């Protein structure tokens, strides 16, 4: 079976070479126009990338918010149906109280589980402070009124 002339490997290679030579001749004849097309293509690519990032970030934050809102709405509807005699509950203040309690728990939680870890952390802080002092004291002072020449 013989391939048609338009799809033979020699014809494909010649078409590629012909296209490369045509592009080179266009660039050599119109360098400003070629530069304009190149810069325009780069700018369009950057704008499309930025748009994709913005859309991805906004969709990502929206997807994170929705399950929480849906959960709260389901909870409100179930509490309204079960507690119709008690009245409506203020979920905003309830959430703020929970956040405040969670914050207090993190403040009261001991980060270091043992005295050895606490001692290591204190030694590390002291070492960092000493290194910082050495670094600050080791820097040469360059006052504006003094000459840089050491030999007067």
Curated annotation (Swiss-Prot):
Expressed in lung, kidney, liver, pancreas, placenta, but not in heart and skeletal muscle. Its main location: endoplasmic reticulum. Residues 70-97 are annotated as: Disordered. The modification Phosphoserine is found at residue 114. Residues 82-92 have a biased composition (Acidic residues). One of its GO terms (cellular component) is intracellular membrane-bounded organelle. InterPro entries: EVA1_A/B, EVA1_dom. It is a single-pass membrane protein. This is Protein eva-1 homolog A.
């Amino acid at each position: 079976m013989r391939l048609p002339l338009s799809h033979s490997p020699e014809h494909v290679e010649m078409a590629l070479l012909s296209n490369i030579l045509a592009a080179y001749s266009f660039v050599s004849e119109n360098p400003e126009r070629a530069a304009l097309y190149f810069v325009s293509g780069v700018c369009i690519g950057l704008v499309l990338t930025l748009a994709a990032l913005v859309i991805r970030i906004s969709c990502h934050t929206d997807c994170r918010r929705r399950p929480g809102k849906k959960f709260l709405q389901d909870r409100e509807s179930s509490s309204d149906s079960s507690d119709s005699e008690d009245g409506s509950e203020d979920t905003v203040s309830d959430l703020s109280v929970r956040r405040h309690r969670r914050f207090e728990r993190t403040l009261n939680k001991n980060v270091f589980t043992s005295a050895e870890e606490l001692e290591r952390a204190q030694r590390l802080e002291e070492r960092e402070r000493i290194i910082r002092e050495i670094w600050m004291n080791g820097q040469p002072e360059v006052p504006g009124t003094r000459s840089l020449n050491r030999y007067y």
